[in-house]
UniProtKB/Swiss-Prot annotation:
Protein name: N-(2-amino-2-carboxyethyl)-L-glutamate synthase
Listed cofactors: pyridoxal 5'-phosphate
InterPro entries: Cys_Synth/Cystath_Beta-Synth, P-phosphate_BS, SbnA, TrpB-like_PALP, TrpB-like_PALP_sf
Assembly: Homodimer.
Taxonomic lineage: Bacteria, Bacillati, Bacillota, Bacilli, Bacillales
Binding site for pyridoxal 5'-phosphate: N77, S185, T186, T187, G188, S189, S272
Family of this protein: Belongs to the cysteine synthase/cystathionine beta-synthase family. SbnA subfamily.
Length: 326
């Protein structure tokens, strides 16, 4: 056997996690804002963590075998992560998606060989989540040995982030953390990471960033275009009492946040990252200078070239929000 250095992994899956953290000096010069670059996971997003954790847990406990057919409703990133891992482990996968998935994400999922079921009808809230869930239930009833990942209700979702990025953040940041800011959709990442962070930094304030029009925190549903943030249902794994503050951001603000991040820091990240940047800009107007803020950048920008990085899309969102051109 050829001797390998510690830097050489046996599998691509071994490279999930241990993502770098950078301080956003240029964008937030009066505060210490540290961003964990979750888009540097091999599948391009933080969703690699729950995908790997849930599948490996299922295999370990006999819930997933070589004959299992994985099923999940996804807006893109988890679908990519599951497709990557399913390909490596030789498992069948069907992703239930909707028309708001970015064209790039859809192509990546298909390139990995996963089956794709596209729903077309929006649900009662104007989104597609409940329609996707109904399709999942239909597939579970018709496919033998099907296993539903069920990210909105699966406790393994938040546990993957608790043991993963949450632990890595605590190991990296030695000074007191004043605020942890994270986007929400399934709420697995904010629940898992914040629980780990609070163990070492009990005074940290947990700030959720949600999309305007999302119903997670009780707001009325309105039409949303940006995938990967917000939801048209309340996730079962959410514990609202653990969230100190919620900041809602619209699609236009999110796009501007993405563009500011690349202009000031050279970081090319996805739509929900723009939401985070916009939320932190709001947060710092009401907190002390020099506060330590920790956040995550969930996915890569190249998956949003037709969305937040499209001038045509930006103008459409600007018009929708009633913003006047200068």
């Amino acid at each position: 056997m050829i001797e390998k250095s510690q830097a050489c992994h046996d599998s691509l899956l071994d490279s999930v996690g241990q993502t770098p953290m950078v301080q956003l000096h240029q964008l937030f010069p009066k505060h210490e804002v540290f961003a964990k670059l979750e888009y540097m996971n091999p599948g391009g997003s933080m969703k690699d963590r729950p995908a790997k954790y849930i599948i490996e847990h299922g295999i370990k406990h006999g819930l997933i075998t070589e004959n299992t057919h994985l099923i999940e409703s996804t807006s893109g990133n988890l679908g990519i992560a599951l497709a990557m891992i399913a390909k490596i482990k030789g498992l069948k996968l069907t992703c239930v998606v909707d028309p708001k998935i970015s064209p790039t994400n859809l192509k990546i999922i298909k390139s990995y060989g996963a089956n794709v079921e596209m729903v077309e009808e929006p649900d009662a809230h104007g989104g597609y989540l409940m329609t996707r869930i109904a399709k999942v239930q239909e597939l579970l009833a018709t496919i033998d040995d099907a296993y539903w990942i069920n990210q909105y209700a699966n406790e393994l979702n938040w546990q993957s982030h608790y043991h993963g990025a949450g632990t890595e953040i605590v190991e990296t940041i030695k000074q007191p953390i004043d605020y942890f800011v994270a986007p929400v959709s399934t709420t697995g990442s904010i629940m898992g990471m914040s629980r780990k962070i609070k163990e070492g930094h009990p005074n940290a304030q947990i700030v959720a960033v949600d999309a305007k029009g999302s119903v997670i925190f009780g707001d009325k549903p309105i039409n949303r275009e940006l995938p990967g943030i917000g939801a048209s249902r309340v996730p079962e794994i959410l514990n609202r009492s653990e969230i100190n503050q919620v900041i809602h951001v619209d699609d236009y603000q999110s796009a501007l946040g993405c563009r500011k991040l690349i202009d000031y820091e050279g970081i090319f990240a996805g739509g929900s990252t723009g939401s985070i940047i916009a939320a932190i800009e709001q947060l710092i107007t009401s907190i002390e200078e020099g506060a330590t803020i920790v956040t995550i950048l969930p996915d890569r920008g190249d998956r949003y070239l037709d969305l937040v990085y499209s001038d045509t899309w930006l103008e459409k969102m600007k018009s929708r929000q009633g913003v006047k051109s200068e």
